Amino acid sequence: MTPQHHLPADIERTSLSIITAELDAMGLTPPPETAAVVKRVIHTTADFDYARNLRFTPGAVAAGVAALQGAAPIVTDTNMALSGITKPGLTRLGDTALCYMADPEVAALAKANGTTRAVASMQRAAAEHPGAILAVGNAPTALLTIADLIETAGLRPALVIGVPVGFVNVVESKERLFAVCAAHGVPAIVAMGRKGGSNVAAAICNALVYSAAGMLDPTDRGWK
């Protein structure tokens, strides 16, 4: 097979067509309401397992889109996830994304309380942006903090994206978060199991931003 040069917009369209065809062939066609998120994650990772392990509370995608259209900010647990979120999409929506992990006040709070920056950053996010979209791609402790705040402090974020990757406390934290969100009516998108990562968190955010901003086709995002 001879490699060919393709324009970015054509690459994305062709990739998504391949993803759609392969999902259909495997009997894993996602429901229309979650398809954009599932396909965006597979496009980012080339991993079709996400068609099986991404779980959504009822109406989670619609809640995320509505929140972004209402200017709810996105708060991530890593600067890597933050850097992967589409800036043109956020600009079109008049929206913002932020991460507190490198904030000196968060570092000081974590040290004073003998906890992690991930915990302190989510505590600050809950205090300053209680209606935000919280996107976690790295730290299980961030998910556990969010779950605790939902249960004990009445936190009601617009959406929780829980996709940390790893082997220690990852599966358990995701299961707890999903159960707590489902029990308290908090919209959630969670990658069950060990897989995930900051790139997956950013991909889910981008799928929501593109939908909210009407940028579903690559040319809508300025690609040629």
What are these regions (language model features)?
Residues 158-167:
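ADP-ribose/adenylate-binding Rossmann-like module
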Residues 81-84, 141-146, 167-171, 197-201:
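Short glycine/serine/threonine-rich phosphate/pyrophosphate-binding segments
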Residues 52-67:
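A short, well-structured juxtamembrane/interface segment
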Residues 90-129:
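Long, charge-dense
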Residues 77, 161-162, 204:
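Buried hydrophobic positions in well-ordered alpha/beta secondary-structure cores of metabolic enzymes
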Residues 1-31:
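Charged, compositionally biased N-terminal leader segments and the immediate start
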